[in-house]
Amino acid sequence: MAISTPMLVTFCVYIFGMILIGFIAWRSTKNFDDYILGGRSLGPFVTALSAGASDMSGWLLMGLPGAVFLSGISESWIAIGLTLGAWINWKLVAGRLRVHTEYNNNALTLPDYFTGRFEDKSRILRIISALVILLFFTIYCASGIVAGARLFESTFGMSYETALWAGAAATILYTFIGGFLAVSWTDTVQASLMIFALILTPVIVIISVGGFGDSLEVIKQKSIENVDMLKGLNFVAIISLMGWGLGYFGQPHILARFMAADSHHSIVHARRISMTWMILCLAGAVAVGFFGIAYFNDHPALAGAVNQNAERVFIELAQILFNPWIAGILLSAILAAVMSTLSCQLLVCSSAITEDLYKAFLRKHASQKELVWVGRVMVLVVALVAIALAANPENRVLGLVSYAWAGFGAAFGPVVLFSVMWSRMTRNGALAGMIIGALTVIVWKQFGWLGLYEIIPGFIFGSIGIVVFSLLGKAPSAAMQKRFAEADAHYHSAPPSRLQES
């Protein structure tokens, strides 16, 4: 496809803007705490949109609309499950984790928090969790780089190899320079761009088809099953789709946003902003695919690319319905979704190496300046490994991404949830929950028992493991229980009246 000048200019301005934010954040990064968690200074608006953007990758603008375009409204069960899971995560985990990480050695990372929370002198929790993060997030990063390369390849007519570097370069640069603040500030801009694209596009599609009623009739005429929420689904399938929401409790890049909030009181306001953003974005993505059925049914001559690859439904609608300047802005939203998730994952990998391996085992007394530069170098190293994996988009290792979400959700989810909710939890309980949750996901995936998504049994068995091994072993030390009680009391302290929860 020949790229228009307006679209090229729009993409370049957008990418330059993200790099500029990285340089601005660089000036605010004084120490390693700033580089990894932004000095715990994020207000509710940035916390909310950064958490949302880091969660929603290119799947939001390509995968979900494409699935709905192919199969109808029944594909929206996953969006319902994600919404419920995210809300419960904000409600039960976000504020508590913000407080508990501060009370446990002012932990900067999830492995660091586990070590402090459970007084793990053996540091086995730190090692296992850091290695799990490093392994799966490097693969996640590779998947994000492939998505960015595909966008540049199809939009600019580049070769895949050129697109690979072009798509990754800007994200690597602003993450390297500005660290957590750059990632969070760019996430906020990117989240705003994503919601703009996902609200505007379906509205224009509906208008172009003749209104909501006419669009719905066209969709029904094509196939009545398009409007059937239960099309081809049994109870297990619905539970499996909704089970995706359990993954939120264990995603390190999302949990890092909670840890970086300026106060646990601001989490209440952040939750409202984030959930509003998420519901509107998911509804918009479903609407793009759903009403795209009507548009391309009325314009079959324009449906060639979409019929070959349903995930292009948003791209094609943007290019057909809008002038090149607006189309460039809308297509930048896909790049925003990819960049926001990739940058967060690069930073989490970097922090796992720098804080949980380099500082913990090699250079305990390293200076703040040294740690910041090691963190920056690790961003480059992880990015280069991810690019090497992404060089062959057919690489089978990239298939691991399909259940890495389940792996994190089952291995870390129950541990995080119980750690902030139950004072009797012990190190052995945490270790058992992590191992049982991860192994269940791996084994269940191989055998596919009952057709049930592996995160559900993984989460259940991991939770059981935590309870059983915690109760069988020695009770937590008096110091551990006192620290938990103090953190819990702090969490339940009265918030300022303007943020008081209803």
From Swiss-Prot:
- Please, one GO biological process term? short-chain fatty acid transport
Null mutant phenotype: Mutant is defective in proline transport. Shows reduced growth rate when grown on propionate as sole carbon source.
Q: Where would you find the membrane-spanning parts of this chain?
A: 6-26, 42-62, 68-88, 127-147, 163-183, 193-213, 235-255, 276-296, 320-340, 371-391, 398-418, 428-448, 449-469
Q: How does it sit in the membrane?
A: Multi-pass membrane protein
UniProt keyword DNA damage, yes or no: no
Summarize the protein's role: Catalyzes the sodium-dependent uptake of extracellular L-proline. This protein is also capable of using lithium as the transport cation. Also catalyzes the uptake of propionate.
Under what name is this protein listed? Answer: Sodium/proline symporter
